[in-house]
């Protein structure tokens, strides 16, 4: 019998959630995603020392530019061993500023193009705030496709679909974490709140004819991945990808299009109200932005203090 990883690839596009070039080359995903936390880990790997040096040398003392140059250098390397696309993230500190997000997205695309990488192989990752979604809407019209991340609520998913974004990344594991702590209980299988959230979004998109890709993210265990077999894409850490590759047994498609809710079009006030009413989404979005911003600052400091 083929491994569970190979079976999953029959239903779902598998994406590697890492900046580890060697792991990507070994596990052979279609696409790859990075974020400030993963880039901070990548910066500690010996193979990226030269990228760090060049990023710093070419940035004129601008630590933010150095981070973008490093992210693009890592992304270009990864694109050499995958057939698909790399997701590169805008500075999380810009999550509530549409204009600044647009400017940073344009810079990332320009840096990739300077390296001979066309925009068709890049997704710009942006936090799923109201301001981030509005910036993504403009980028999509410009032919720059986006990956809306830190997505925890149905309101965020509905707004992203209405804006015509290319792809969303709902965070399964972080939703699970919040409910496990809040309710003081464990969840397995289809009752997992993170699994239920992604399943609801997937069926809503399919029922209403949205083309936005649903890419489940942030997994804590194989059970969550198995429940979402059939999702458009799943971005998975190297450790869990390896566990799937080492696992035998049948992996059926469990997520199928089905009855979805009627289409919702949310204006800003409705979006903000629905977010306000969802304590989990409000807390996890804020926490996620803070964590990514913290790791961005750590990476900037590391680049600024290189000798």
From Swiss-Prot:
Pathway: Carbohydrate degradation; pentose phosphate pathway; D-glyceraldehyde 3-phosphate and beta-D-fructose 6-phosphate from D-ribose 5-phosphate and D-xylulose 5-phosphate (non-oxidative stage): step 2/3. Its main location: cytoplasm. One of its GO terms (cellular component) is cytosol. Pfam families: TAL_FSA. It is found in: Cytoplasm. One of its GO terms (biological process) is pentose-phosphate shunt. Its EC number is 2.2.1.2. Keywords: Cytoplasm, Pentose shunt, Schiff base, Transferase. It comes from the Bacteria. It is an enzyme of class 2 (transferase). One of its GO terms (molecular function) is transaldolase activity. PROSITE patterns: TRANSALDOLASE_1 (PS01054), TRANSALDOLASE_2 (PS00958). Transmembrane segments: none annotated. HAMAP family: Transaldolase_1. Homodimer. Belongs to the transaldolase family. Type 1 subfamily. This is Transaldolase. It comes from Pseudomonas paraeruginosa (strain DSM 24068 / PA7) (Pseudomonas aeruginosa (strain PA7)). The gene is tal.
